[in-house]
């Protein structure tokens, strides 16, 4: 029998210590990694429930185990809320990640050797859209589209490639693209050549839920996503689909890719979807966009170039070449000042992938803390201060002190 006072702190002091240090880091650092966010206490509470004990292979009402009557309620709540959030015909909330959601679509409609088309990783795409070392690049023939001279998606070239190669699946979506994507144009060319159309909206899901970014659901056969990032839920994935594709997607996820779903995580997803349906979430996402714009403008004013010269979402790529500093060094320097970001390749980057000429910045996490345009502008200036004085320890310490003032004034969990 377990005792209710058998806490983590008592059971595993080493692990507890590491978690407490991470908690302190999250509180005292400004988080600008575009794919990260802070989830709510309610989401974390759901993930820590007894649902973690339950195996539930199958789907609500069609399980391979007994005792699933209550987890059926949990999963159905998640499904219904998700469909309402995006106006979808059908939804699968079982994928353990965005990558597995993408794999579920691949398994449902493709065979090894089929041709797929996605955005080039080097120009802002995601590794699961055909990168050579990913299973998508190893199992399928990949045709990649990219950007034009304005660093916008080259839709004309994409259409030419689609007509020439006739891929079975066209993928839209990105991990480092700041502008709005014309999903309707992708859908038209997919229909013209008889291809399936999939959108990976992992980065934009929260913005889309709030109407701050175009919704791909009316145009795509399949829409995949993570549940964290801008959606602010637990780490996981989901798939939205047209009604006629529900059976093949469900079969692809279980038993095709996964066994028992993580019911405690699905509970966290259900909570996050309910939060995203609230009016406050729309206000939050509006501020996410405003803060990203303010951050980008502050950096531009300090002589830094933003790829595409603007952002229309939560994310931006910063070209560091004018400051004669690499993305790797910038990430480390900013980290020492308690500003967390990630190095990122820019289009046609001359540097190696682990070095890069840029950094990627995002506004969702700082907006969750309560930052508004004034704070976002200040953060932009603090970033520029560090990058302009990379060898000045006094600048690092001054910026760190300014960061501390901001994080004390805007705690993650009040």
From Swiss-Prot:
The residues that cross the membrane are none
What interactions and quaternary structure are annotated?
A: Homodimer.
Query: What is the name listed in the Swiss-Prot or TrEMBL entry for this protein?
Result: Serine hydroxymethyltransferase
Tell me which family the UniProt entry assigns to this protein: Belongs to the SHMT family.
Q: Which CDD domains match?
A: SHMT
Gene label: glyA
Positions modified as N6-(pyridoxal phosphate)lysine? 229
Keyword Endoplasmic reticulum (UniProt): no
A Pfam family hit: SHMT
What chemistry does it catalyse, as a reaction equation?
(6R)-5,10-methylene-5,6,7,8-tetrahydrofolate + glycine + H2O = (6S)-5,6,7,8-tetrahydrofolate + L-serine
Q: In which pathway does it act?
A: One-carbon metabolism; tetrahydrofolate interconversion; Amino-acid biosynthesis; glycine biosynthesis; glycine from L-serine: step 1/1
Query: According to UniProt, where does the site described as Plays an important role in substrate specificity lie?
Result: 228
Record: residues binding (6S)-5,6,7,8-tetrahydrofolate? 121, 125-127
What are the BP-aspect GO terms?
Answer: glycine biosynthetic process from serine; tetrahydrofolate interconversion
| Keyword Transferase annotated | yes
Q: What does this protein do?
A: Catalyzes the reversible interconversion of serine and glycine with tetrahydrofolate (THF) serving as the one-carbon carrier. This reaction serves as the major source of one-carbon groups required for the biosynthesis of purines, thymidylate, methionine, and other important biomolecules. Also exhibits THF-independent aldolase activity toward beta-hydroxyamino acids, producing glycine and aldehydes, via a retro-aldol mechanism.
């Amino acid at each position: 029998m377990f005792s209710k006072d058998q806490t983590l702190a008592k059971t595993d002091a080493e692990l507890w210590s590491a978690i407490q240090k991470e908690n302190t880091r999250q509180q005292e650092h400004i988080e600008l990694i575009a794919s990260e966010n802070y989830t709510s206490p309610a989401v974390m509470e759901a993930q820590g429930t007894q649902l973690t004990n339950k195996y539930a292979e199958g789907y609500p009402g069609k399980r391979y185990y007994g005792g699933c009557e209550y987890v059926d309620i949990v999963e159905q709540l998640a499904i219904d809320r998700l469909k309402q959030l995006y106006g979808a015909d059908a939804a699968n909330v079982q994928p353990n990640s965005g990558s597995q959601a993408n794999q579920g679509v691949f398994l449902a409609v493709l065979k090894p050797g089929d041709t797929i088309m996605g955005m080039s990783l080097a120009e802002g795409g995601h590794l699961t859209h055909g990168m050579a070392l990913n299973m998508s690049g190893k199992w399928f023939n990949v045709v990649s589209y990219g950007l034009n001279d304005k660093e916008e998606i080259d839709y004309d070239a994409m259409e030419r490639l689609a007509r020439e190669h006739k891929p079975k699946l066209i993928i839209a979506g990105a991990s480092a693209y700041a502008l709005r994507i014309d999903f309707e144009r992708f859908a038209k060319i997919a229909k013209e050549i008889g291809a399936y159309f999939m959108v990976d909206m992992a980065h934009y899901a929260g913005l889309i839920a709030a109407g701050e970014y175009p919704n791909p659901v009316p145009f795509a056969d399949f829409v995949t996503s993570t549940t964290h990032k801008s959606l602010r839920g637990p780490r996981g994935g989901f798939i939205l689909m047209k009604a006629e594709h529900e059976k093949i997607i469900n079969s692809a996820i279980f038993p095709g890719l996964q066994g028992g779903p993580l019911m405690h995580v699905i509970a966290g997803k259900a909570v996050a979807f309910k939060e995203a349906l609230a009016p406050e979430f729309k206000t939050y996402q509006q501020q996410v966009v405003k803060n990203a714009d303010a951050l980008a403008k502050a950096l531009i004013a300090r002589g830094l170039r933003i790829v595409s010269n603007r952002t229309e979402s939560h994310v931006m790529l910063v070209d560091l070449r004018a400051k004669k500093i690499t993305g790797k060094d910038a990430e480390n320097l900013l980290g020492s000042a308690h500003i967390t970001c990630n190095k990122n390749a820019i289009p046609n980057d001359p540097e190696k992938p682990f070095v890069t000429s840029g950094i990627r910045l995002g506004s969702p996490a700082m907006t969750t803390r309560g930052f508004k345009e004034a704070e976002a502008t200040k953060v932009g200036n603090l970033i520029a201060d560090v990058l302009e004085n990379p060898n000045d320890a006094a600048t690092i310490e001054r910026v760190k002190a300014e960061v501390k003032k901001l994080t004390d004034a805007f705690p993650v969990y009040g």
